[in-house]
UniProtKB/Swiss-Prot annotation:
Residues 32-63 are annotated as: 3 X approximate tandem repeats. The lineage of its organism: Eukaryota, Metazoa, Chordata, Craniata, Vertebrata. Belongs to the apolipoprotein A1/A4/E family. One of its GO terms (biological process) is cholesterol metabolic process. One of its GO terms (cellular component) is high-density lipoprotein particle. It comes from the Eukaryota. GO terms for molecular function: cholesterol transfer activity; phosphatidylcholine-sterol O-acyltransferase activator activity; phospholipid binding. The gene is apoa1. Sequence repeats lie at residues 64-85, 87-107, 108-118, 119-140, 141-162, 163-184, 185-206, 207-228, 229-239, 240-262. Residues 64-262 are annotated as: 10 X approximate tandem repeats. It is found in: Secreted. Keywords: Cholesterol metabolism, HDL, Lipid metabolism, Lipid transport, Repeat, Secreted, Signal, Steroid metabolism, Sterol metabolism, Transport. Participates in the reverse transport of cholesterol from tissues to the liver for excretion by promoting cholesterol efflux from tissues and by acting as a cofactor for the lecithin cholesterol acyltransferase (LCAT). Its main location: secreted. This is Apolipoprotein A-I.
Amino acid sequence: MKFLALALTILLAAATQAVPMQADAPSQLEHVKVAMMEYMAQVKETGQRSIDLLDDTEFKEYKVQLSQSLDNLQQYAQTTSQSLAPYSEAFGAQLTDAAAAVRAEVMKDVEDVRTQLEPKRAELKEVLDKHIDEYRKKLEPLIKEIVEQRRTELEAFRVKMEPVVEEMRAKVSTNVEETKAKLMPIVETVRAKLTERLEELRTLAAPYAEEYKEQMFKAVGEVREKVGPLTNDFKGQVGPAAEQAKEKLMDFYETISQAMKA
């Protein structure tokens, strides 16, 4: 039992210094000690609960011994931890220094590797370019073959479609003529209907046109009768100007008469 407590205490002290790479080992060691003591308290509590489950009649004496052993274990772990604290701290400092030295060596190795690899970047690029060129040379014939196949297929499709297109073009002309033939009767029917309606309108308007023409002839005759004497009266007074005015009036009259007769 004492050996177990001592081993746990030493393991606790060593593990405390193995994790960090900084110089804050004593403070972290204290945290681990506290955690270890809490863990021992939990172990004792769990063991005590298990002991309490035993029958008091049959295992009473055994339960007392186990409880005492748990108390002794916790007390011994605490005492041992306190007595080994100086050694643990010294060991932790040594471990921290060793870890720092290892870290420095690792960083130095990494830097050395980087320095050695730097000149090889050009070589690596050359190798990669070579591989890519090899892939391109292998793939290029396949790609050309696929492109040529597609071109051949498209040409074959065009050859097949050309007669169909020509046939459709010829059918379009035929269809236009058929459509025209179907539309002509409809157009003629509409034209006949319009002509019929125009004749009906002319028949209805004819009496009104004749009446209007008679009224116009009557009005022109009245104007002529009134203008005739005036021209005779003014003929001697105005001379050639009056004669010209008369001629213009007569021409106007004749124009109106011709328009009404049309």
